[in-house]
Structures are given as structure tokens and as C-alpha cells.
Amino acid sequence: MSQSHLDDLFAYVEERCLWQFFSRTWDREENIEGVLNQVGRLLTGQEPLRGTPQERLFYADALAMANDVRERFPWASQVNKEEIEFLLDGLKSRLVDVTITRSTNRELNHHLY
């Protein structure tokens, strides 16, 4: 796993995934965690969670992302489960930093939302 793999995934999410930009901090955190956990399950051959409507929603977004990752990035088929988990943890951290921590959108934490 290299920094370039993390950069590849981050650029992909920034370009293609709207779930990272929900209107509240807790929504963004929930989506980042939920979708990327499902992506991890799909990329490592585990059965995705689909027991609740929320899990099915995350699964739908994750399925498209996992398929795109396999198609766009040849390295995705060469990394093991631990590397995928490490990579997705790094991606989660970067997304939280960019879309929540350093966001200038004051509505994210507005008390009336």
C-alpha cells in the first residue's frame, strides 16, 4: 500500500461520491463510515451487511464504488485484506478532515439542524 493508492481513492471519492457532502456533521460521519465499511467488505470478499434500510443504502453506494475501484485501479486486486483496511482507514481520516474538520460550512454544526 502506498500513499499514491490513498491519493487515488481520495481523488475518486472527491470526484464521484456525493454521500460525503450531506448537510450535517453527523450525517457526513455516518455516511463516510457506513459506505467505506461496506466497500471494505466488498473488496475483501466478505458478505456486505444488508439487514436494515440504512445498511442497504450504504451497500448501494459501496457496490458502485467497489466496482469502480476494481476497474480503475489495477493495484486493487493485488492488495490483501489488512492493506485494504489500512487504506480505507486512511481514506476515512482524510475525508473527515477535509469535509468536516476543515470545512468552512458553519451549517454543519448549527444548533437548529
UniProtKB/Swiss-Prot annotation:
Q: Is Oxidoreductase tagged as a keyword? A: yes
Tell me the GO molecular function terms. ATP binding; iron-sulfur cluster binding; metal ion binding; nitrogenase activity
Report the enzyme's class at the first EC level: oxidoreductase
Q: Any S-S bridges, and between which cysteines?
A: none
Cofactor(s), by name: iron-sulfur cluster; vanadium cation
Return one Gene Ontology term, BP aspect.
nitrogen fixation
Which catalysed reactions does the entry list for this protein? Answer: N2 + 8 reduced [2Fe-2S]-[ferredoxin] + 16 ATP + 16 H2O = H2 + 8 oxidized [2Fe-2S]-[ferredoxin] + 2 NH4(+) + 16 ADP + 16 phosphate + 6 H(+)
User: Which protein are we looking at?
Assistant: Nitrogenase vanadium-iron protein delta chain
Its source organism is Azotobacter vinelandii
Q: Which gene encodes it?
A: vnfG
